[in-house]
């Protein structure tokens, strides 16, 4: 079985009391490690609410046994139903199977990520615009 450690943190922009980013790190019952990150575009209460809802929906679906595609489809659908006006958020979903060592990274509207391996930095996915709540049907998850 694979193992490791993870940590995270968030920081408000200067002058703001609330951060619009939310993350969740943990292990699922099926032996996978999950790291979920959402950036509720902007800052303040609305951005924080949107990013928190996205991460909570991801975790609820994964905890219920949904696979990656089902989870992203369900979150996409729930955000479509909840969408009102011009609301944007991004999602990064990293899953590591602690039994096999296989990992996946799915991105919805998120900026590119980087993989450090053997001292080399390689770009991974990204480049799509942020997803608009109520308009996710045209956004597809990029996977790496």
Residue map of PLM features:
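Acidic loop->beta-strand submotif enriched in PP2C/PPM serine/threonine phosphatases
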Residues: 16-31, 91, 123-144
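Short, mixed charged/polar active-site loops
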Residues: 3, 33, 103, 121, ...
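Short, solvent-exposed secondary-structure boundary motifs
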Residues: 11-16, 81-85, 102, 134-137
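Cytosol-facing boundaries of transmembrane alpha helices in integral membrane proteins
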Residues: 1, 6, 119-128
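Catalytic core of PPM/PP2C metal-dependent serine/threonine phosphatase domains
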Residues: 1, 48-118
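Active-site-proximal, acidic helix/loop segment immediately C-terminal to a metal-coordinating Asp/Glu
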Residues: 42-64, 128, 132-135, 144
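N-terminal entry segment of metal-dependent catalytic domains or homologous docking segments
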Residues: 1-40, 46, 53-56, 114
């Amino acid at each position: 079985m694979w193992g490791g450690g993870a940590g995270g943190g968030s920081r408000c922009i200067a002058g703001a009391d609330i951060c619009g980013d939310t993350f969740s790190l943990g292990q699922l019952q099926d032996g996978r490690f999950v790291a979920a990150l959402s950036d509720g575009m902007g800052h303040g209460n609305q951005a924080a609410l949107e990013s928190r809802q996205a991460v909570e929906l991801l975790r609820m679906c994964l905890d219920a046994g949904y696979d990656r595609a089902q989870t992203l489809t369900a979150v996409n659908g729930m955000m479509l139903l909840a969408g009102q006006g011009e609301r944007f958020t991004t999602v990064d979903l990293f899953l590591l199977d602690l039994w096999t060592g296989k990992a996946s990274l799915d991105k919805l509207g998120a900026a590119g990520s980087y993989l450090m391996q053997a001292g080399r930095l390689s770009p991974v996915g990204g480049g799509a615009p942020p997803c608009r709540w109520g308009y996710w049907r045209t956004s597809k998850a990029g996977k790496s």
